[in-house]
Amino acid sequence: MKLAAFYKGRDLKKPSGGKKGRVRKTKKKALCGGPPQIPKLGERDLRLVERVTGGNLKVRVREVRYANVYIPKERRHVKAKILSILSTPANPDFARRNLIVKGAVIQTEVGRAVVTSRPGQDGVINAVLIE
């Protein structure tokens, strides 16, 4: 897969279609991103530790079974099993494909909850129970 497909730098064309002046001869590798890593609902918890820019480490979730659910009435968190994904405002297709993103409504053992974390970036699924 070519990294240029996920280039995060400035566009090299003007709105009219003409070319802009180039700052360098080629696209900088540091400005090339990668495909989105959206976690799936699975039978186990699978996390990957990746090296990112600056030598830092980022934990990404690939498969997940449990979520940390905050219960506002009781003011406490519980680890609850995710039963299904009900809806995803970002993309309705994500719910059909069992992909979990921020804002997704999930069905857990304790009830319906909204995902508040970014699982592909944070490495954990945090959610708030819907009353």
Swiss-Prot record:
One of its GO terms (molecular function) is structural constituent of ribosome. The keyword Ribosomal protein applies. Residues 16-30 have a biased composition (Basic residues). It holds the Pfam family Ribosomal_S8e. Coiled coil: none annotated. InterPro entries: Ribosomal_eS8, Ribosomal_protein_eS8_arc, Ribosomal_Se8/biogenesis_NSA2. The keyword Ribonucleoprotein applies. GO terms for biological process: translation. Keywords: Ribonucleoprotein, Ribosomal protein. Residues 11-36 are annotated as: Disordered. GO terms for cellular component: ribonucleoprotein complex; ribosome. Part of the 30S ribosomal subunit. Belongs to the eukaryotic ribosomal protein eS8 family. This is Small ribosomal subunit protein eS8. It comes from Pyrobaculum islandicum (strain DSM 4184 / JCM 9189 / GEO3). The gene is rps8e.
